[in-house]
């Protein structure tokens, strides 16, 4: 069938083929793809809802992120009431200060009018973006949110193929694209999405899979920032990769 598992399988095969090509050429994939830069702005994905985790614990987590070198951090919203989540945003901004970028991710939790309410209340906290406010297929609702707030809207982790991203762009439903090459069709399709984004003056901030996406976002001129998960999110994740990515002064460097 279309999309779903089929496209994810294609993604895995395509990624493996690019890995083989890099090994044969004795070059890192980011250089095979153009090698625009060897370091990328990076944010730590954090601020998850957890049992027993209140505002005090959230504040401590943000402090830890900054101490380990983060210049940008992201937290979850959408599981609590709008006012409760605004309080979470406020606490994070107070802890990290004004020089650290702050993003929020709703994981499709809101209806469009709820997302607009949240965004308007959150604007004073200078958010770098508001991620996935509504269901992935609600291009019309998301476009209305985009028009209703000064906060850039980011989305795309649940989108498949360049045609899905084309539809999102044509609806003016997004300001920052978040493709995931493990989902949308692999490295080859990811690069086509990046070219499409560039032709529409949009930046790329890939979703997850930092060990893969460091190569892709390093290869393009419109790569905005890389998502980075600490070991506390999944202690086993970093152990399956030969090259551990280290966050330093807000950047991650592409491995050679």
PLM-predicted stretches and their roles:
Residues 19-23, 195-198, 215-218:
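Short glycine/serine- and small hydrophobic-enriched flexible loop segments
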Residues 9, 14-17, 189, 208-212:
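Catalytic-loop motifs flanking and including active-site residues across diverse enzymes
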Residues 75-207:
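Catalytic core of soluble alpha/beta enzymes
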Residues 34, 47, 158, 209, ...:
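Residues that form or immediately flank small-molecule/cofactor binding pockets and catalytic motifs
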Residues 205-256:
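Flexible C-terminal active-site loop/helix
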Residues 1-102, 107-109, 113-124, 237-256:
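N-terminal capping/lid subdomain adjacent to the active-site entrance of alpha/beta enzymes
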